[in-house]
């Protein structure tokens, strides 16, 4: 999660949760409304990895009016595969680089910023309506500094695709399986996919980090071969 003011507002969800809800909806196991995305929504995705691209493209296909990826670094520094980035651009995803989220805004706060007056509603203080971001500049020596003021991005939904780490449950309860400093399972090239515990194999996001479903399936088949 992103620990900034407003994180308790309705309309903020993780990319993994959103994508799982979409899969369940597509399989008929969940009502479409429970994906927490509605036709015409303005969606902001925070992060620029493969999962972020997947979530952004999925949101467009689910009927979102506008989908914007917000990233705190430059275009050249996005962590997704180039092909995933290019596909997102083709599908209409917009990109807002060098922006650092600093607060989620509710409807009441957005109305105050826009100087709009109307009868208060119960959802005014509980529903997400915007994201406040700090503009960032990259200096000649590669440092990122906060300058250039702040901006507000109106949105009905924010999808978080940052800071994802594998769940430690299996590793912490199974002796002999080592992970790297990021929490990902260490595997060997020969035999391919075997962990540091003999006879135990691993593949997918828990090894190489969040990526695409296609890559996870490809790696799993390779390990099983």
What does each model-found stretch correspond to?
Residues 1-4:
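Small-residue-rich anion-binding loops in enzyme active sites
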Residues 13, 94-96, 132, 201:
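General small-molecule cofactor/ligand-binding pocket signal
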Residues 28-64:
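Rossmann-like NAD(P)H-binding beta-loop-alpha module
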Residues 98-110, 122-126, 136:
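A conserved short coil-to-beta-strand element within the FAD-binding core of flavoproteins
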Residues 206-225:
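A conserved FAD-binding loop/helix module that cradles the flavin
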Residues 8-40, 111-112, 119-121, 125, ...:
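FAD-site-proximal beta/loop scaffold in flavoenzymes
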Residues 56-103, 121:
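Rossmann-like dinucleotide-binding cores of NAD(P)H-dependent redox enzymes
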